[in-house]
Amino acid sequence: MAIRNFRPYTPGTRTRVVTDFSEITSRKPERTLVVAKHRRKGRNNRGVITCRHRGGGHKRLYRVVDFRRNKHGVPAKVAAIHYDPHRNARLALLFYADGEKRYILAPAGVQVGQTVVSGPDAPIENGNAMPLSSVPLGSAVHCVELYAGRGGQMVRTAGASAQVMAKEGDYVALKLPSTEVRLVRRECYATLGEVGNSEMRNTSLGKAGRRRWLGRRPQVRGSVMNPCDHPHGGGEGRAPIGRSGPVTPWGKPALGLKTRKRNKPSNQYVLRKRRKTSKRSRGGRDS
């Protein structure tokens, strides 16, 4: 897998950088694993906007992904690597020995024809799923469960992986991609290796239209709005926001304020907090 750069034939291709899709082996998805999904466009059940700047975009069909890997001891053959419009990672189509077909997140390095298996006695190979108690120290894992049997909830984006740091008692210490070190129950399942398509972080959309194709609408800065639309709005010309710090459209502190509760019960499982990120690195902008 590699990335593809374009010559400046048009303004949209001047800065466009995409993955070359060379790892995709089949264009059509498995029909038995595809369902229609209503797009919420950032609205809740009452039609109220709960997530701004969402809407439009290309039509999609949802691929049903197996995050549980609960067919223990049944070997599966990787039949194809598919594209998924709902995520940055690729999907691996598995044909199990009993005839069942399932999608999983395609781990890095997994090839068509390779055999993967899940279970406590699975071999230590890339793509196999097993309890964290069976994973060797220092190994990279992804699609990690927070609660046993609920399915992988952490470390699922393209190129992501967590590292097994230590084992003590009923818990395993994991170093997450955010550098946070967290305790997870040893019976929780995880998949060996990192998620594929790691070059996704080096891509660039190149133009605003490609962002619209993904269902992302334009973001307007609060400082150019009217005061009735945003606390930063109003004034003559490029006026300052007139506050001690930036706020959201609803007047809540923004850009740097910690929103995690101090007495959150799961704080006892966080051994080391994630590193502090600067405004530039996290892509902060005027709300």
UniProtKB/Swiss-Prot annotation:
GO BP field: translation
Assigned keywords, A-Z: Ribonucleoprotein, Ribosomal protein, RNA-binding, rRNA-binding
UniProt key word Ribonucleoprotein: yes
Entry's Gene Ontology cellular component terms: large ribosomal subunit
Region ranges (Disordered): 221-287
Pfam families: Ribosomal_L2, Ribosomal_L2_C
Amino acid composition bias (Basic residues), ranges on this chain: 271-287
GO MF entries: rRNA binding; structural constituent of ribosome; transferase activity
Function: One of the primary rRNA binding proteins. Required for association of the 30S and 50S subunits to form the 70S ribosome, for tRNA binding and peptide bond formation. It has been suggested to have peptidyltransferase activity; this is somewhat controversial. Makes several contacts with the 16S rRNA in the 70S ribosome.
Protein family per UniProt: Belongs to the universal ribosomal protein uL2 family.
Subunit structure of this chain's protein: Part of the 50S ribosomal subunit. Forms a bridge to the 30S subunit in the 70S ribosome.
Protein name: Large ribosomal subunit protein uL2
Biological source species: Synechococcus sp. (strain CC9605)
Lineage summary: Bacteria, Bacillati, Cyanobacteriota, Cyanophyceae, Synechococcales
